[in-house]
């Protein structure tokens, strides 16, 4: 199902001297290293846009996958900083993509994608949350940034693509 695509679509290249994680998923980079007994490199394309003319090594690395129709920006920072940013940017068509339980403190309409400390919930809720934003007619979305390690790396990678790599430090 689309809800579990964050976990199912993991890609690892064994074509070179060192394994390369091209697309993170449920099995973390650290777990792969333990199981394989060697270092696993993280492809630059996991956290950054491909450079002009650079070829994608795996499907899903090149395009803005799963993005809603709205413009999405990831906001990196504390919840207090996110809340202040939302207060100054709340307008018609602006939505918060936040963690479950945060919505009462936010001034804009909200769609949640799991609890802040539960990347497994985030992984299962992210795509349906993005579709919900479409259904509600969101024009602009400011997303809370998930963690960037372990299983949450997969969530962050998919959200980065939905945001076309737009990230703002708050």
Residue ranges and their predicted role:
Residues 1, 15, 25, 44, ...:
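Residues at the C-termini of beta-strands that transition into short coil/loop
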Residues 56-164:
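A C-terminal functional module that forms or caps the active site or interfaces directly
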Residues 168-170:
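Short, flexible loop segments at boundaries between secondary-structure elements
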Residues 2-7:
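Short, small-residue-biased leader/transition segments that mark boundaries at the very start
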Residues 43-63:
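Long, charged amphipathic helices and adjacent flexible linkers at domain junctions
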Residues 8-13:
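Short beta-strand scaffold segments in enzyme catalytic cores
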Residues 28-29, 47-49, 79-80, 102-103:
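Short, catalytically relevant binding-site loops at active-site mouths
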Residues 14-41:
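A conserved active-site cap/scaffold subdomain adjacent to cofactor or substrate pockets
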């Amino acid at each position: 199902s689309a809800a579990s695509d964050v976990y199912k679509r993991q890609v690892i290249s064994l074509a070179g001297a060192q394994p390369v994680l091209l697309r993170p998923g449920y099995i973390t980079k650290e777990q792969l290293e333990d199981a394989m007994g060697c270092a696993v490199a993280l492809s630059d394309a996991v956290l950054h846009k491909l450079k002009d003319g650079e070829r994608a090594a795996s499907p899903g690395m090149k395009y803005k996958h799963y993005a809603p129709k709205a413009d999405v920006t990831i906001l990196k920072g504390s919840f207090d900083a996110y809340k202040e940013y939302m207060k100054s940017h709340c307008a018609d068509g602006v939505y918060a993509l936040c963690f479950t339980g945060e919505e009462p403190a936010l001034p804009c309409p909200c769609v949640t994608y799991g609890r802040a400390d539960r990347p497994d919930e985030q992984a299962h809720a992210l795509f349906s949350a993005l579709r919900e934003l479409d259904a509600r007619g969101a024009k602009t979305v400011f997303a809370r940034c998930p963690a960037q390690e372990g299983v949450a790396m997969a969530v962050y990678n998919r959200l980065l693509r939905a945001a076309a790599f737009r990230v703002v430090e708050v």
